């Protein structure tokens, strides 16, 4: 009988995406979570993680469950004033009507409305008329204008509970897919399972950077991956969870593992919505890779450094500019 990997319920089971569906995750654990746990995870941490990657999702053309690529909130400068704008998935910039206040030569206050979309001017005029205000129509030359749209991105979420719990849940769900739900629900994995459900500290998931790993493991900015290994001698099961090729999490899945040794890697292509069967790396196996992270020269829990590394490599791969 299928059961929820988080609470053990056999009622109202739903698909569990190993990597979030809205981030292009295509690997699925059928009947993996109940509707309640699925909804709770989305509300408590996954939604913030997914929404934080809106700019990456738009640039890669990754659709959500409704088949829509996200639009982006941006800032443009027009006539010396900052104004909000929206960047649509196809690259078009939509600017809502803007209100400019200034003084004329006689010291009188002028209010000027600028519109950028057909129909907006008429709506402003009609609204003013309803208030008994007559607006003067002052047409300007129909000139094409170039504006720079600036998108402000905060990556703090990658080191908060939203990022850490999403990574831990991905590692745990992948383990359940590979080893079976019944085994994943055993006491061996209580710690990581309880963290996925309830959060809190200490966390089994951590951000990391490691020069040797970064030089030896190669996937694209459109790919996600999980590397996992269980070692009976050390009683440790641990995993690496990698988003967009350049954001790295280390997850302690269990410190009481006593089963047979195992190691595996799974990956998916977020742009193509398909599982990746072959990953390029210079490690002999997953055991060595994970031990290199756990025991080597690893830089831990640095949100800024991890965020800078992600966006620097993402921009380089796509030929973009990030500051």
Q: Where do the language-model regions lie?
A:
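Histidine-centered nuclease catalytic patch
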Residues: 9-28
């Amino acid at each position: 009988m299928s059961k929820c990997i988080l609470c053990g319920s056999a009622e109202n089971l739903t698909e569990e995406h190993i990597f979030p569906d809205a981030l292009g995750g295509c690997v699925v654990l059928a009947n993996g979570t109940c509707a309640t746990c699925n909804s709770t995870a989305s509300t408590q941490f996954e939604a913030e993680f997914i929404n934080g990657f809106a700019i990456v999702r738009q640039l890669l053309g990754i659709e959500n469950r409704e088949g829509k690529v996200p639009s982006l909130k941006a800032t443009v400068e027009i006539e010396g004033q900052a104004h909000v704008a929206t960047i649509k998935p196809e690259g078009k910039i939509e600017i809502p009507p803007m209100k400019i206040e200034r003084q004329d030569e006689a010291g009188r206050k002028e209010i000027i409305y600028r519109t950028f979309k057909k129909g907006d001017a008429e709506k402003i005029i009609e609204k003013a008329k309803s208030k008994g205000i007559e607006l003067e129509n002052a047409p300007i030359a129909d000139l094409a204008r170039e504006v720079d749209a600036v998108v402000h991105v905060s990556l703090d979420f990658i080191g908060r509970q939203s990022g850490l719990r999403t990574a831990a849940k991905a590692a745990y769900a992948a383990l359940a897919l590979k080893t079976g739900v019944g085994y994943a629900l055993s006491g061996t994995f209580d710690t990581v399972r309880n963290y996925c459900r309830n959060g809190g500290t200490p966390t089994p998931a951590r951000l990391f950077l490691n020069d040797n790993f970064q030089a030896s493991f190669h996937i694209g900015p459109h790919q996600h991956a999980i590397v996992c290994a269980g070692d009976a001698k050390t009683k440790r099961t641990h995993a690496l969870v990698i988003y967009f090729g350049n954001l790295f999490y280390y997850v302690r899945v269990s410190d009481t593992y006593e089963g047979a040794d195992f190691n595996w890697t799974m990956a998916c292509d977020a742009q193509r919505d398909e599982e990746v069967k072959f990953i390029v790396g210079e490690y002999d196996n997953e055991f060595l890779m994970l031990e290199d992270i756990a025991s080597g020269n690893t830089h831990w829990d640095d949100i800024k450094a991890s965020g800078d590394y992600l966006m620097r490599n993402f921009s380089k791969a796509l030929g973009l500019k990030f500051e």
